[in-house]
Every structure is written in structure tokens, then in C-alpha cells.
């Protein structure tokens, strides 16, 4: 799943209410409705005076995910993409035809991760970067970028990855190094106080025989791991900054 970035690349993170740019202050985006339109349209001004090549990370709010079980009969990327399109059509209906879908391997015999993004978003990004004279080298979902950054610490272990974005959480479960589930859910500002309950409900929904108590939180604000551990001794929690992960080179 790794996509390597050169250290000299301009790295950009697009969130519903913010634009993160390596070596620069965060750009606040006003008047957005939670869609990608406002941050993307604010991008032209943020790129003024910059050249070279860039890698973009998209907030999970702009991405749909699905895990595809490994199937040895599927040999080519085209076959995997066809399966992914069928899955998204089943889940979301005809609008899936308007999405750009990519499938990536999580491990040699593990499930494939299918990611779908509005095709007009990709096309608009291409237009903006061309007009700015910047080569757009890659576009990557936040969850994928974050996992690539922490995958060595996860190894063949088990953990929850919790990604905080405005009004929502993305929850990804990894067991023994294998991706098991990805779920998105709404969340209010008090989600930190009930995170164990959230994960326990998700575990029950998935029918886990053994609890997974390691949690890696990608937070947009402060996350007090010491306080959390004092309240919930059974949980081992690590916190990473959302902005730092979005802009990190690998």
C-alpha cells in the first residue's frame, strides 16, 4: 500500500475546513459545507508562488472505502477494479459510476483496499495544479497515508486506527497484521470520553472473539493518552497529530 514521496515534494492535505501545506501555516477554509468543493477552490490561492511537484492527501470524509477479500482467481488490476466497482455499486447504487476507484494490496494474501473518490474532484485537482505549474505526483486518502507512516510499528500486531475529522471518525481494525474492517461514523466533540464504548460496540458488531485494546488515534486536537490510560487501564493508546501525518514523508 506504500506510495513513496520524495523529501523535496510539496505535501498538501485537504480537509473540509483546512488546507495543510508543508512548510507553511494551515489555511482555514470558511463557508464550507463539509464537501470537497470549498477547500479545493481555495487551493489555487494557497499554491501561488510555488513550483515543483506535489503529493496530495485527501480527508477520509472525501473517500469511500471497502475491503475486498483476497481471491486467487483475480490476476490483474482490471479484474480487481471490476470487483471493486461491483461492490461500490451494490453499496451505493448508480452514483458509483461517477467515482474514480483504485484498489491496493494490504499484504500479499490479505484483503485489497478499494478507495473511491469523486471523479470531478480528481479532475479539478489536475486542472488547478496544471494552472499553477506544479506537477501533481500523487493523490492519496488520509487513512492510507497514515497507515503507510505507522505500518512498521503495527507490523503483524493488532490495533484500532481512529482518525478524527470534523464531525466524524474513521475506524480501521487490523488483526495480526491483516485489515479486518473500516467503518465511518458521526462523532461529536465528546467522543474522546466515550472512545472505549465506541470501540467495544464496534467489536461486538464484528463478533470479535478477543478484544483489540491497542488504539492509535490520529487526532486533530490534543489527545491526552496518559489521562485516557488512567481511566481505562485495559487500553493502550497512542496519539499522533492529523496534520503531521497528512504532511509526513515516508
Sequence positions of predicted segments:
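Hydrophobic/aromatic-enriched cytosolic interaction surfaces used to assemble or bind macromolecules
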Residues: 1-250
Amino acid at each position: 500500500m506504500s506510495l513513496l514521496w520524495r523529501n523535496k515534494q510539496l505535501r498538501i492535505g485537504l480537509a473540509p475546513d483546512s488546507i495543510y501545506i508543508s512548510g507553511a501555516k494551515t489555511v482555514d477554509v470558511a463557508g464550507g459545507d463539509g464537501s470537497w468543493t470549498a477547500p479545493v477552490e481555495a487551493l489555487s490561492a494557497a499554491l501561488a508562488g510555488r513550483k515543483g511537484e506535489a503529493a496530495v492527501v485527501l480527508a477520509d470524509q472525501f473517500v469511500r472505502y471497502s475491503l475486498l477479500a483476497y481471491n486467487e482467481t483475480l490476476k490483474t488490476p482490471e479484474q480487481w477494479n471490476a470487483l471493486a466497482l461491483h461492490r461500490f455499486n451494490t453499496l451505493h447504487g448508480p452514483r458509483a459510476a461517477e467515482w474514480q476507484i483504485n484498489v491496493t494490496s494490504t499484504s500479499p494474501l490479505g484483503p485489497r483496499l478499494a478507495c473511491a473518490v469523486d471523479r470531478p474532484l480528481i479532475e479539478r485537482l489536475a486542472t488547478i495544479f496544471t494552472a499553477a505549474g506544479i506537477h501533481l505526483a500523487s493523490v492519496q486518502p488520509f487513512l492510507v497515508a497514515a497507515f503507510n507512516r505507522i505500518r512498521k510499528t503495527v507490523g503483524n500486531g493488532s490495533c484500532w486506527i481512529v482518525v478524527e475529522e470534523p464531525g466524524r471518525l474513521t475506524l480501521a481494525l487490523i488483526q495480526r497484521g491483516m485489515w479486518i474492517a473500516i467503518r465511518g461514523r458521526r462523532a461529536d466533540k465528546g467522543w474522546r470520553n466515550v472512545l472505549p464504548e465506541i470501540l467495544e460496540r464496534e467489536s461486538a458488531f464484528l463478533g470479535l472473539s478477543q478484544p483489540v485494546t491497542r488504539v492509535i488515534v490520529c487526532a486533530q486536537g490534543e489527545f491526552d493518552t496518559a489521562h485516557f490510560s488512567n481511566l481505562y487501564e485495559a487500553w493502550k493508546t497512542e496519539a499522533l497529530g492529523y496534520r503531521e501525518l497528512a504532511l509526513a514523508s515516508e
